[in-house]
Amino acid sequence: MAPPKPSAKGAKKAAKTVTKPKDGKKRRHARKESYSVYIYRVLKQVHPDTGVSSKAMSIMNSFVNDVFERIAAEASRLAHYNKRSTISSREIQTAVRLILPGELAKHAVSEGTKAVTKYTSSK
């Protein structure tokens, strides 16, 4: 699932430049989706007085995308092995345990479980 439109301070704004092609019709540039807004929010929760450069934000965004793709691919593989057509929280949890090392996996699983519980209780 891709993140929604960026809106917070400190995030890179998407290009809204309107170009005029040969046929005379206006075309808008596609918006580049990123996790920069959410990375910035987490940074401000952890270190309110610390900033982040655009290069560092780009690296963090690449990192989040990479981890997301690895977990999604592993969860997809697990669902296929078990002849399931739906990826559930169980597949995601198992994928996280397989991909992330030791203590990091334990923390990720507990935070994920907490997030799923919060989401289901709010419905």
UniProtKB/Swiss-Prot annotation:
The UniProt keyword set, sorted, is:
Chromosome, DNA-binding, Glycoprotein, Isopeptide bond, Nucleosome core, Nucleus, Ubl conjugation
Output the PROSITE patterns linked to this UniProt entry.
HISTONE_H2B (PS00357)
Purpose: Core component of nucleosome. Nucleosomes wrap and compact DNA into chromatin, limiting DNA accessibility to the cellular machineries which require DNA as a template. Histones thereby play a central role in transcription regulation, DNA repair, DNA replication and chromosomal stability. DNA accessibility is regulated via a complex set of post-translational modifications of histones, also called histone code, and nucleosome remodeling.
The entry lists its GO molecular-function terms as: DNA binding; protein heterodimerization activity; protein-containing complex binding; structural constituent of chromatin
Q: Where is this cross-link: Glycyl lysine isopeptide (Lys-Gly) (interchain with G-Cter in ubiquitin)?
A: 118
Q: Does the keyword RNA-binding apply?
A: no
The places in or outside the cell where this protein is found are: Nucleus; Chromosome
The organism that produces this protein has a lineage beginning with: Eukaryota, Metazoa, Ecdysozoa, Nematoda, Chromadorea
PTM text: Monoubiquitination of Lys-118 gives a specific tag for epigenetic transcriptional activation and is also prerequisite for histone H3 'Lys-4' and 'Lys-79' methylation. GlcNAcylation at Ser-110 promotes monoubiquitination of Lys-118. It fluctuates in response to extracellular glucose, and associates with transcribed genes.
Protein name per its UniProtKB record: Histone H2B 2
The record's Pfam families line, in alphabetical order, gives: Histone
